[in-house]
Amino acid sequence: MLQCAPKKNERLRGSCDFCTQSKLRCNKNKPSCRRCTIQQQVCVYSVARRTGRPPKHPRRADDSQETSGQHGHQDPMTSAPADSCEQQSSHLDLEGDDTDFTLVDGRTTAEGRATVAPPVLDNAFLMGETFEFNSLLDDPLVQSEDIFSFSPHIPRGEKGVHMASFHALNESTSPCSPSALLSIDVPQLPTNFRFLESFIGSELHGRNEPHPVEQPDEMEKTYDKGSILLGLDSAINAITNNGKDEPSISGWTVARPHSKHLCFCSMSMSKLQVLVSHPALCRQNSRTPFDMVLFLEEFVFGIHSDVLRCLICQSRSLHSLASLCICTDWVVEALVDVAQDLSLGQDNLGGLRAEICPPKNGSSIYVGRLILADQFRESCTRSLVKYRLRKLIPIMDTMIKLNYRGAGGALSQAIRTMVEDVRHKIESALGMMEL
C-alpha cells in the first residue's frame, strides 16, 4: 500500500479568525492582535491549509479481484503484491447503444479482456474524437484509379448475372478491395420490376409468396412504400458491410439518423461507388435503363442531404466531395443520353415498364394500375428529365461553397474544376432540351 509522506510542522494563519471573517486587516500580534484586544474577543489563529497536491490514498480493489482472491484463484497475467498500484478503469456508455466499453489504464484480467474496447476506440474516447467509416477513397492502400477501373469483362452466353451468397462474402478476406468487388456479381437492374423483385428478393430473403406485380392492388402499395428496390439495397449492403446484414442507408429509403458517435456518410458513398462503377450495372455497349438512372439520381440527392445534416463529418472530406462529383457527373451523362434518345425517337425507357398484364401496345408504360398514353409519353419523360437535372444544380452550388471552406491545394482545385464542368453540362443539357 502507498504510504503518505509525514506531515510537516503545522503552520498557523497570518491573521486571526475574527479578522479573517470580518475581512479586516490584522496586525498579527500574538497571543492577541490589536483588534481582538479592543473588541475583547478571543484571538484564535487557525492552522493554515497545506499547499501542493493532496496525498495519494490507496485505491480500493475491484470486485472481480476480491472475488477471485476469496476463491484462491489468480490470473497469471496480473501480479498481486501488496504495494502494487491497482488498476484503474472507467466505464463509458454510448448514448443510444447497449454496449458497455471499458477503458483500461493497465493490464487487464482474463475476465475483462472480452469487454475491453480496442486501442483505437480507447484513443477516440480519450481524445474526444468520433468514429469514422472510411470510404474506399480514404484508404491509402487503394488507389483512386483502381476503384473506377473495374474490368468490363463479362462471360459470353450469360444473359444475367448471379449474386454471390452471404457465406461466400463472409469467407472472403477483404470484400471491399477492388479484386474482391470484381469477384462479386451485383444483380443488374432489369427492365421491369417483376424481374427485379423476383430475382433479388427470392435469393436474399427466400420469398415464396405471390409477387406484388401479379396483384395490381399490392403493386401500388409496394411502389408507394419504395420497397421495390429493397433487394438491390440489400445486395449493396452485402458488399459494403463484409457480408453482414446491416440496416440500409440509401437515398431511396428512409435514411438512418446520425447518432452522436457514428457517421454513415462514407458508407453511403462506398455504396454509390459500387453502383456506378460495377460492370454488371454499367456496360459500355448498352444504355443504362432509365429506372436505374432515376434510382442513382435519388441516391445522389439523398447522400447530399445526409452529408449536409451530418454533424460529425461536416462535409470536410475532399475525397467524399470528389467521389460525389464524379458520380453526379455520371448521372448527368445518363440523363443527357435519355434526352438524346427522346429527340432521336429511340426507345430506352424499358425500365419504366412494370407489366401487370400483357399490353396491347408494347410501347405503353404501366406504373401500378396507371397507363400512360403513347402521345404523352415523350413529353412527360422530357419534363421528368428536366426536373431531375434542375434538382442537381443546387447540389453543385453547395459543393462549390463547401470546397471553398477547405484548405487550398491540388485536390481542392480539381474539385472546383469538376463541379464547374458538371454545372455547365447541366445548363447545356437544359438549353438543348428547350430548343
UniProtKB/Swiss-Prot annotation:
Protein purpose: Transcription factor that regulates the expression of the gene clusters that mediate the biosynthesis of the host-selective toxins (HSTs) AK-toxins responsible for Japanese pear black spot disease by the Japanese pear pathotype. AK-toxins are esters of 9,10-epoxy 8-hydroxy 9-methyldecatrienoic acid (EDA). On cellular level, AK-toxins affect plasma membrane of susceptible cells and cause a sudden increase in loss of K(+) after a few minutes of toxin treatment.
CDD domains on file: GAL4
Keywords of the record: DNA-binding, Metal-binding, Nucleus, Transcription, Transcription regulation, Zinc
Range of residues in the leader sequence: none
Single GO MF descriptor: DNA-binding transcription factor activity, RNA polymerase II-specific
Subcellular location: Nucleus
Coiled-coil boundaries: none
DNA-binding region: 16-43
Major localisation: nucleus
GO cellular component, one term: nucleus
Biased composition (Basic residues): 50-59
Top-level taxonomic group: Eukaryota
Protein name listed in UniProt: Transcription activator AKTR-2
Species: Alternaria alternata
Other known facts: Gene clusters encoding host-selective toxins (HSTs) are localized on conditionally dispensable chromosomes (CDCs), also called supernumerary chromosomes, where they are present in multiple copies. The CDCs are not essential for saprophytic growth but controls host-selective pathogenicity.
